[in-house]
Amino acid sequence: MQSVTECYSKVKKDCFRYIASQETRTEKFKNKDKMIKSFLIPVSFYIANRANKEKTMIVGLAGGQGTGKTTISSIIKMILEKYFKFNVFKISIDDFYKTRKERLKLSKNIHPLLMTRGVPGTHLSLIHI
């Protein structure tokens, strides 16, 4: 029987390393142990228990800008790969933003708000991909 404790012992170093890479000097994650043990690992178990080797599973994560979607999905991906030995592909809206240089040009030529990621018009269109 797989357990949260067993999983935590196998993934904690990688999780903490990833979290450290996301922290800044002024913004630190609080309650990292609790976040991993009480939320991220149980969610990973939930996903793993519903996975079917015959079909591709798609899991979506929604939330506002800066709410931790990338951090959460990256750590869950890490847990699913390392502990459950799943093949995981993660994609983020961040992967489809125009470059900073492109957004700067748009902000000068069209509107200053286009410098900010997330504003309509700052994503690559399917034609450009």
Language-model segments: which ranges?
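Pre-Walker A adenine-sensing motif
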Residues: 42-52
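Walker A/P-loop
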Residues: 70
